[in-house]
């Protein structure tokens, strides 16, 4: 029997198990509303695994998953690996052991991979399609070198919503349902009135959420008034700041990203991004997770917006890490220093008489939205002039972590790698679409 036949049989068997479990849950709800609620919270209905694939010998199961992982390396055939992880707990545990995260294997397989750091030794190439009529943005994983004809693998979507004092981008794993109440929403991006300061919110708890630092504060409200449901939270994981474009319309914008959820030590030898989810499948989110978050006018002035008063030069690493002009202590520097990203300084092109960045063929249309982000390891220097070229930075400082640029009308490429995740890179890229009233 071929591996594709095995996967097909497993998928059919898994579908019958899901239907059987659904029927059992329906019967449980018929017993009564109050009894059904207690039953749902404290006594989950077990699904009887009657499929013959659930009792395969471990050696045979390992061989099947390893062969499948090696042969189905790209999408859309990689969906068979996802199907195997959904058969039963035994298959899921085997997939967790064999299928590595994007940081190690350079592949996006499960939904949780969107929150995990990209590859260390490579680049995750993606592209974004913009639908101006609906103000919707779609992130795809590139499956080929020709971006304009590449259908890609859908990863995330974002819906732009205007408010009186700000703009919001709701980020979802669903390409069609972008309502605020869906359980596929995983975060959002919120701007100030001028479009110069942004905050990235995530529904996943960051590693420092329980600390007293600024990045650990959360927004909590109950999903429905008068109910005893568990509150849902969104966590501020990053701040983005844009400043006056000293290069005019011919150069990239000046931006800085303060990544609360990524420590600066993650770029050092042996460094890691903490608090990575153990589950390979996405945890089910509360259906009112975004409806429960308060974003009133007063909430705009929370800890996240304190970043708006800090100058670009204040958020640097010179005499010591500083945030908003305050130099961190030794203990804070050791425990809480976040990763700081800033845009790479362009070089002056004598023939074109303009500022240029080397996107290595991934960006083909000049746009003020184009940018490259690198780790900030020294104070931001003043604007270079044609007579005073910028001295080349050290190789480790010059490594591009995220680049974004235009290739056609409503088509943009987005390439990222460790320590950013697809969700974080997408949110940062979305900030470039917003109008910057005070930057140009």
Swiss-Prot record:
CDD domains: F-box_AtTLP-like. Signal peptide: none annotated. Residues 51-106 form the F-box domain. It comes from the Eukaryota. Ubiquitous. Pfam families: F-box-like, Tub. PANTHER family: TUBBY-LIKE F-BOX PROTEIN 13, TUBBY-RELATED. Belongs to the TUB family. This is Tubby-like F-box protein 13.
